[in-house]
Amino acid sequence: MTPYSSAADLGSTVSPLEGLSSVITKNTSIVSQYLQANNLPQPSPEANGPVVVLPSDAPQDVQQARQQLIAASLEIFQLAIGPSEFLPHLATNFQYISCLTWLAHYDIFHLVPRDKNISYADLARATGVPEQRLKSILRMAMTSSLFREHPNGTDVGHSAVSALLASDDDAYSYATYMCSKTAPMAMSMTEAHKRWGASTRTNETAYNVAFNTELPLFDDLAQNKARMGEFARYMRSVRSSETVALKHLVSGVDWESIPAGGMLVDVGGSTGGAAIALAQAYPHIRFTIQDLPENVETGEKAAAASLPADIASRLTFQAHDFTLPQPVRAADAYLLRMILHDWPDEQAVKILRNIVTAMEETKSRLFIMDTVLPKPGSVPVSVERIARARDLTMIQSFNSKERELDEWKELITAADPRLQLIAVTQPLGSAMSILEIQLSAK
């Protein structure tokens, strides 16, 4: 993606506001004309508005125009409010989280009919909450595109955003997890640092402060099936995002370079989604999917029940803890997808070393698919701020982090100096990059 030209880069003859206005006008036209030319719906706040603005196969220049439009809109907003109004607008952000939490708790998303309006009075009776309080919270939420009020002032209906949360269980779990877990963790980050400083222990985190537990996040969630189910649905929603779609893994590497009958080991591969996507595209490769026993059992049963024999026969499910030495030796490829960002450097090095012990020099390759943080200002702020929010979430959850390229290089070298980073690829539209690593001869 080309770097975004901020207001400071627009030249001295044009004011920042005028320059950004031109960027917005230009890129709005590109996006709108593409949608019109391809008979696609224009973005709309109405309940029947499209969930996705651009299809995943939209041309690169159109995708970039959308990102430039978002970034310029964010920057012109900041310039227009000025420093004097920064704090009042900042306060709206946590109030939106508060509204979302309240609306989810009282099941407002599902009590508002999908295809018609409902009066505030009837909705208040259905929920057992005071009508005036319901109005106050809904009307605040409406200023961030959640729900829409009928012009009569007495009825409320869905917007495009609230309709999505009402109809998509995974997206709804994303919202409730954000409110019940991510937001409290974020607000506990300072207290965690005051208590434990630069600790990288997984049970000395903002999560531990927020929820008063001595257990690491995953161990704590595992104590409660409902919470673990919410987390699983939340992760399903995250992984369904276009930016982390499996197609980027499938197309982002020259998998044809693996010889016929070669083996790829998906370390921490959950129930096999990534390996199955690769198996469907590359019939010459065999796969071993490794994860904790309950995950591989679930994946193995699902694969046997739903996959054609020519794919299922190339999948092997194996219970394995990646904090222990890798049992599959001399495989052609090992894959760590969305794994290492959950772990502080010390544990991440251990995970890598456990794989290195199984790699065959010059033959085996290790592929890490994870976030590579951009250099500040090198991508549109709309992209950068989401990446940096993920980085903070990793700190707050696990005392881990998203890594810059130099940090990845240091991590790889610390695991074994023989490991050589031979390629870094970020597929178009992917939030993650693929690091290709080989074990050199001694």
Swiss-Prot record:
Pathway in which the depicted protein is active: Pigment biosynthesis; Secondary metabolite biosynthesis
Pfam family, one: Methyltransf_2
Induction entry: Expression is significantly up-regulated at the end of late growth phase, in the presence of Butyrolactone I. Expression is positively regulated by the pgm cluster-specific transcription factor pgmR.
UniProt-annotated binding residues for S-adenosyl-L-methionine: 291
Keyword flag Transferase: yes
Enzyme Commission numbers on file: 2.1.1.-
Disruption phenotype: Abolished completely the production of the naphthoquinones derived pigments and leads to the accumulation of four new compounds which lack the O-methyl group, including 6-O-demethyl-5-deoxyanhydrofusarubin and 6-O-demethyl-5-deoxyfusarubin.
Keywords: Methyltransferase, S-adenosyl-L-methionine, Transferase
Listed GO MF terms: O-methyltransferase activity
Highest taxon of source: Eukaryota
One example of a Gene Ontology biological process annotation: secondary metabolite biosynthetic process
Active site: 341
SUPFAM superfamilies in the record: S-adenosyl-L-methionine-dependent methyltransferases, Winged helix' DNA-binding domain
Role description: O-methyltransferase; part of the gene cluster that mediates the biosynthesis of pleosporalin A, ascomycone A, as well as a third cryptic naphthoquinone derived pigment, all responsible for the coloration of conidia. The pathway begins with the biosynthesis of the cyclized heptaketide 3-acetonyl-1,6,8-trihydroxy-2-naphthaldehyde by the NR-PKS pgmA.
Family designation: Belongs to the class I-like SAM-binding methyltransferase superfamily. Cation-independent O-methyltransferase family.
PANTHER family registered for this protein in UniProt: DUAL O-METHYLTRANSFERASE_FAD-DEPENDENT MONOOXYGENASE ELCB (PTHR43712:SF19), PUTATIVE (AFU_ORTHOLOGUE AFUA_4G14580)-RELATED (PTHR43712)
Protein name in UniProt: O-methyltransferase pgmB
Origin species: Aspergillus terreus
Gene: pgmB
